[in-house]
Structure formats: structure tokens, C-alpha cells
């Protein structure tokens, strides 16, 4: 497969896409969740170039103590965008305590809710999305998505969490390509563009949790294979299992014919 990527052209295309969308839909402001990682950093920079830094609002959403929140502040300062911080830690704790009270024992007519670590981990992104939607509506702004194609392909994202947005800024770029685009924008700190991606939830890097390198996912997407059949199959299985995260909910047809009730 013949693959070429022009980072500067991709950057300029995305800036124009944001401007065109804003004009078509009649909005001038965007809200972005700023994690301090490459995806939100590059998204914020693209939006600032497209709409002006004064129209970009960064929201920092630590869950309790965030050890690298200084990186989030650096992004906002470097781009000249205004920001606010909302700590979702107490909200997450309250929800965790409420669900813990359900316990492993169910009363008559109730069902058992077993403890589930991944469910708890995914509460964070969903709470963040609730706060971001609040800010966007209050400011009359659109919510810019920050997820990339590599994450979406293997389902490394939270349904109704970071997948929720009004436009998906980077969903046409792999993780590798996001870095390349980011490196064409001198206004953002280079080290943040090249920062090791983590989920900010489990204490592990993305690649550690996935068991797959982003470079391999990139090659799988752009070349059809990463060069290792076993890894290709691992990516393919994740892709198929997580298609539901990339599609609108299935609408059932009440007028379908030929089905037995």
C-alpha cells in the first residue's frame, strides 16, 4: 500500500475544516478537555489557530490528585487560552460509595451488581464529559473531541466518555500522525507532543494496557499489516469487538417485515 503523509498539509486541512464547520453551524467558541497529553494539546492548538485563542476554553479535570496537571497548565499558557479547573474526585468518590453500597447481595426483585474495576475506571471519562458538556452549553460553544484513529481502532476509549464530542478533530489521524502534526506547530511545547501517552486513570501507559505499540497500530491502519501476523490478529480482534464504540446506536425497525414475534 502506497502511504505518504504530509504533516503540514494535514494541519492546514484540519484548521480549514474547523473554520468551515464553525461557519456552517454558526458557532465561534469551542471547549476542550485539557489533559496535558499530545491529543488534547494538538487539538487545542488547531482550534486556536482556526478560531483564535480567545475563543478556545480549556478545562482541566483532575480526578483527585493529578501529578502532571502542570502540563495541562503549560498547554493553556503556551496557547494563550483561558482555562478553568474542576476536580471530579469528590463526585467520583460519591458515585463509587453509592455503587459499593449495592454490594454482592440482592433483595427480592433486585439483581446483583458485582464489583468491576473497568467500570470504575471508565466512570472518570464519563464524569469529565458531563462537566465538559456543562461548560459547552453554558458558553454557547461546541465540544472538540481529542481522540485519535489509533485509539478508536482498538477501542481504547470510553463510550459516552471521551468518544462524545461535537466534532472529532483528530479521528482521521493515527497516534503517530498526531505527533507529526504537533511537531509542525512551534507554539506548543515539543515535550508534550512527544509525551508517553497514558490514560491518566490506571497509572499505566497506553501501550502497557493495550499490549500493542502505537507504531504497530499505525502500520496496521495505513499499510494493512504491522509486519507481524500475531499482532495483526490481536489488533483485528480488538477492532471488531469495539466497532460499537464507533457507530451510532442501532435503530430497530418497528415496521420490518418477515420477522416472527
For each feature predicted by the language model, list its residue ranges.
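Conserved G/P- and acidic residue-centered "switch" motifs that form tight phosphate/ATP-binding loops
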Residues: 37
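Generic detector of well-ordered alpha-helical packing
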Residues: 40, 149-152
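ATP/NTP-dependent adenylation/nucleotidyl-transfer catalytic domains that generate, transfer
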Residues: 1-32, 46, 54-57, 63-65, ...
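Active-site signature of alpha/beta-hydrolase-fold catalytic machinery across serine-
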Residues: 42-49
Amino acid at each position: 500500500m502506497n502511504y505518504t503523509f504530509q504533516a503540514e498539509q494535514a494541519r492546514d486541512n484540519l484548521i480549514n475544516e474547523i473554520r468551515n464547520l464553525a461557519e456552517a453551524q454558526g458557532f465561534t467558541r469551542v471547549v476542550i478537555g485539557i489533559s496535558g497529553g499530545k491529543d488534547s494539546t494538538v487539538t487545542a492548538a488547531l482550534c486556536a489557530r482556526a478560531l483564535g485563542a480567545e475563543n478556545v476554553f480549556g478545562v482541566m479535570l483532575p480526578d483527585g490528585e493529578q501529578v502532571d496537571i502542570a502540563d495541562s497548565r503549560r498547554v493553556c499558557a503556551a496557547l494563550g487560552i483561558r482555562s478553568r479547573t474542576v476536580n471530579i474526585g469528590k463526585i467520583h468518590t460519591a458515585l463509587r460509595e453509592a455503587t459499593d453500597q449495592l454490594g454482592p447481595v440482592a433483595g427480592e426483585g433486585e439483581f446483583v451488581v458485582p464489583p468491576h474495576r473497568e467500570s470504575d475506571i471508565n466512570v472518570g471519562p464519563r464524569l469529565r464529559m458531563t462537566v465538559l458538556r456543562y461548560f459547552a452549553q453554558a458558553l454557547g460553544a461546541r465540544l472538540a473531541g481529542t481522540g485519535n484513529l489509533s485509539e478508536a481502532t482498538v477501542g481504547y476509549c470510553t463510550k459516552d466518555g471521551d468518544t462524545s464530542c461535537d466534532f472529532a478533530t483528530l479521528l482521521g489521524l493515527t497516534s503517530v500522525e498526531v505527533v507529526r502534526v504537533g511537531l509542525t506547530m512551534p507554539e506548543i511545547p515539543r515535550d508534550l507532543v512527544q509525551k508517553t501517552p497514558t490514560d491518566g486513570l490506571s497509572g499505566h501507559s497506553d501501550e502497557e494496557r493495550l499490549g500493542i505499540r502505537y507504531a504497530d497500530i499505525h502500520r496496521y491502519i495505513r499499510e494493512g499489516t504491522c509486519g507481524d501476523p500475531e499482532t495483526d490478529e490481536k489488533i483485528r480482534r480488538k477492532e471488531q469487538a469495539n466497532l460499537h464504540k464507533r457507530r451510532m446506536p442501532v435503530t430497530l425497525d418497528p415496521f420490518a417485515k418477515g420477522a416472527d414475534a
